[in-house]
Amino acid sequence: MSAFRRLQVCAATGLIAAGLAVIPAIAAGTQTFTGKVSDAMCGAKHTEAGIDPAACVRECVQKGAKYALVVGDKVYTLDTSDQATLDQLNKLAWDQAKVTGTAHGDTIAVKSVAAAK
């Protein structure tokens, strides 16, 4: 096989591999997650004695932590800069919520938030 042909095969293989790497991100798409609204600092555990967990969430967010969603044993950091969404998350602190968005590892890019019924 000529050097040029090997280069073509390697380039084609690389393009195929790159395309396959994108498929999981495309397949993931928008999902709805139901869980408890928390913050990324405390996650599922609000252990400071005498502090209401909802107040703890709000205080941690005020100090710079991002909101989070606790789904079973998993804690997702919620990524949004939309003020209406942030206001809704503040209102739902330590309550059950439905969050719609796209998951990227442990982070959800939030599209919408609503109280879970």
Per-segment meaning from a language model:
Residues S2-L15:
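Bacterial N-terminal signal peptides that target proteins for export
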Residues L15-P24:
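Hydrophobic h-region of N-terminal signal peptides that target proteins for export
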